[in-house]
């Protein structure tokens, strides 16, 4: 799943939308601090990189290509488009862990900056300013780190439409809910 990358692609497609309305930045009644904005953008960048690398890994596994994420990061770092120090941080983490869900330093960074992106999203949402990539990154991370996430809702929807059973949070028993 690459929600941040998909959101960036969709935003690019929609950038030529003929039905745009203008939102005046002067009408925003609350300032977004430079620090919060910087932290939110970097948060989203980290999420996007992890999602992209995870996509490469899944492709590699499905096609039996033994693609090394560490080598990908080295090649990107040596290129001319992506030369971010983030690549060095990710390379170090992957060299030590080789799993997307064991990148403790990266996930600790994201956890520490969750409040900054949340604040930016509160202000932009309140003022009808679309931030699809920031929103997708924030929701992706919340979904990864939350006990109660949308998969619970998906299970409920499956039970509603096809009686597939759910497990309530206060029970270990699988049940069908009477939705009527």
Where are these regions (language model features)?
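C-terminal amphipathic alpha-helical interaction region
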Residues: 111, 116-180
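C-terminal substrate-binding/catalytic lobe of Rossmann-fold NAD(P)-dependent dehydrogenases
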Residues: 1-124, 131
């Amino acid at each position: 799943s690459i929600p941040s990358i998909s959101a960036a692609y969709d935003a690019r497609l929609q950038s030529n939308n003929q039905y745009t309305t203008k939102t005046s930045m002067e009408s925003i009644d609350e300032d977004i601090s430079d620090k919060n904005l910087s932290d939110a953008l970097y948060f989203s960048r980290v999420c996007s990189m992890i999602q992209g690398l995870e996509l490469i890994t899944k492709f590699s596994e499905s096609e039996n290509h033994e693609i090394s994420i560490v080598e990908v990061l080295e090649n990107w770092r040596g290129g001319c488009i992506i030369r971010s120090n983030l690549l060095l941080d990710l390379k170090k983490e992957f060299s030590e862990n080789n799993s997307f869900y064991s990148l403790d330093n990266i996930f600790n960074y994201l956890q520490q900056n969750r409040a900054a992106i949340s604040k930016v999203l509160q202000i932009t949402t309140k003022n009808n300013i679309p931030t699809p990539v920031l929103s997708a990154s924030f929701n992706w991370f919340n979904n990864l780190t939350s006990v109660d996430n949308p998969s619970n809702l998906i299970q409920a929807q499956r039970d509603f439409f096809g009686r597939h059973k759910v497990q309530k949070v206060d029970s270990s028993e699988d049940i069908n809910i009477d939705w009527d």
